[in-house]
C-alpha cells in the first residue's frame, strides 16, 4: 500500500466508517456508481491550530455494519451478505418456548446453509440500547444465565465438527447472550423438549446466515450443551473450552440468575490478534465515555458596539477523567461544528444605535465532529487503524435559554431579542483522525453527528416547532397565537441551534471496535537491531557516507529546520534519492532492501484492506472482503501505462525498513517518528493519471480554464503543492497551468480511478530522462516515451548522469514537498 494510502486512515474517517441505519445502501466496487471523493479540510481556531487533514468519507451501507467479523471471502453485494431465517420480538421476563416444528426447521436450514459454506448468526438486540439485560436458559437438567450485557450482542456458529459447536461471541464470558437460542435449537438431550428461554428486557432475536468468517471461538459439546462443564484453556488465536475436563461452577451460574441492578463497567475486550511477518493486527472492543462540549461566540461591532459582526462555534477541547476496570482514564475530546446557515437580519439602515446582525446556526445536515483520544492505549502507538464500529444510536438535542445569549448592546436595556432554537443530532459515521491538542498529538477516534432537524420555511407552526427555529434581533415567531393554536414564524428564522450561546456539555457511554496495525516485534517501534541487521545492514555504510552530502545540501537549501534524518530516510524511502550528489551507492543498497522485503508484505496488505473504498489504494494489493463495516474501498486500478511506477507496498515498507535504528548510525541520524511520517504521507504529492481517469465534466472544466481542448491520450498531473495542472499530450508537448487550489481539489474528489501518487512530477521526470537521453522526446513515439517517462526503476538508474546544478534544481522542488509536509 502507498504511504499515503496506508496512513491516511490515521487522519481520515473515510476508510473505516460506520453509518446509521437510515441511510441508503449501495453495492460496492461499482466504479460507475462511485463518483464522489472526499475533500480536504483544515481548521484553525484562534490561538490553537488543530490540524485535521482529513478526507471526508464516502459511505456505503450494508446490513453487516454492526457485526464485528474478521475476513470474509465473498462479495459485499447486499444480496449475498446475509439471509435472515428467523426474527421475533420477545417481551421482558417472559418464558418463551419454540415449537418442535420451528426448532427442527431452523436446525435443518442452518445445517443446509452450513454445508454451502454459511455460518449462523444469533443476534439479540434490546429495544432500549442503554438498558442492561441478561439471557437465560432453563430445563430440568441444565440451567445457565449470561452476564449482564448492554447493547446488541451476538453469538455465531462458526463451525460444526465431530459433534462439537465452535461459537464466536462478542462477549468475553461463557455462556454469552445468544447461547440460549443455540442450546434451544441444537441441544439433543430429551430434557431440551421442555426447556424455556427468558430475557430480562424486551428484545428482538434474529437468526441469519452469512459466508463471512470470524475470529476467536469457544467449543461446546453438541448433545448436552452443558456450559457448566466447560473450563477455558488458551490456544493461539482462540479460546478453547475442553468438555473432557469437567469443572462444576453451579454457584457462579446460579448467582448470575439473580436479576440485580449494576453499573456499567467501562472495559476493553480483545477480540482477535494475529501476527503476519513484521506486523501484528489487533482487533479490540472498548467501552469509552465520550464527553464533549458545543460552545458558540459572538462579536459586537459598529460605531457604538450594537451590531453583531461575527458569530460561530468554537473548537472546544475537553479534558476529563473516568474509571475503567478500576483504572483512571485520562481522556481528551476536541469538538468542532461547521454551521452552514444564518438567522437574523443585517440592516445598517437601522442606524448605529439599533441592533443589526446575523447569527450562524447549526442546522439541517450540518456536522458536529468529535475527536476522542486517551493518554495510554494501543491506538496511540499504532501505525495504522481501520474498521471503526460503534453501537451508539442515540439522538440528542442541543438548545439553550434565550437569556443565555452571550452578546449585548450598549443601549439600555442592553438586551437583544432572540430565540436559541434547537438542533436534533444523530450519530452519522465515525473513523480515525489525527489531532494536535494542548497536550497530545496523535491518533484519535472520530465521531460525526449530523443535524437531522427538519428544514422548514417560514409559516404557521405549533409552539414546539416554532421554538425549534433560531433567530436574533427578533424572536423566531410572533407572540400572538392563531385560532388553530399555531404561531407565525418569521422568514429571518432558521431551524437549528444558534451560535451565540455558552458551552453545552454532553456525556455518553459508547462501545467502539477497531483494528490496529502494530509492529509484531516490540523493538521494531524504535528499530530493533536484529531486525535492522536482517533487512537494512546493507544500507548502514551508505547512510554514513551520505551524511556529509546531506548536511551540505541542507546548508545550500537553507532548510536547517529539517534534520539529516528526515532528508536521507524520506528521500530514499520515497524513491527520490537522486536529489543528492553521489547517491548511486545508496540506491543500490536501497534496491537490495527492496528485494529483501519483497514478497513478505503481500499477505499483510491483504489483511489490512477490504474491498471497501479508500482513496489511492493500489489494485495490485487487492485483498479479501471485510464485510463487517460499511464503507467500500476505492482502489486505484492502474492502467498499463502506470504499471512501472513504484507500488504501494514497496514505498511503505521501505519507509519503515529504513527507519530502523542501528547502533552504528544512531548517533548520526535522527529518524522519523510515526507522527511525522503521517504528516509526510498527507503532504499531497502529485497525482499522475491518464486523461481517461478524469470525469468528462471535469475535463471540460479544465479545457475552459486552459482555453484548449485536452487530448484524450494525454497524461495529466495534479499538483496540490504548487497548485498546478500539467498536461503531456500525444504531441509530446508538456504544458503547466497555474489554477485555483479548489479546482484541483474538486478534480481529485471526482477522480474515477486509474491514477497513482508519485513524488516524481512530470517536469522532474522530463528532466531526468533528458539527462540521459537528450533527444528522447524526439526519437521515441508517444507510447514508448510514456513507457520510459513513467518507469520509476529506469529513472533511478540514470541519476549519475545528472549534473550538480540539475540535482540542485530537483532538490528545490523536493524541498517544497518536505516543507509542505512538515508545516
Swiss-Prot record:
The record marks 245-246, 260-261 as: Probable cleavage. It comes from the Viruses. One of its GO terms (biological process) is virion attachment to host cell. Signal peptide: none annotated. GO terms for cellular component: host cell endoplasmic reticulum-Golgi intermediate compartment; host cell plasma membrane; host cell rough endoplasmic reticulum; membrane; viral outer capsid. Keywords: Capsid protein, Hemagglutinin, Host cell membrane, Host endoplasmic reticulum, Host membrane, Host-virus interaction, Membrane, Outer capsid protein, Viral attachment to host cell, Viral penetration into host cytoplasm, Viral penetration via permeabilization of host membrane, Virion, Virus entry into host cell. The keyword Membrane applies. Pfam families: Rota_VP4_MID. Belongs to the rotavirus VP4 family. This is Outer capsid protein VP4.
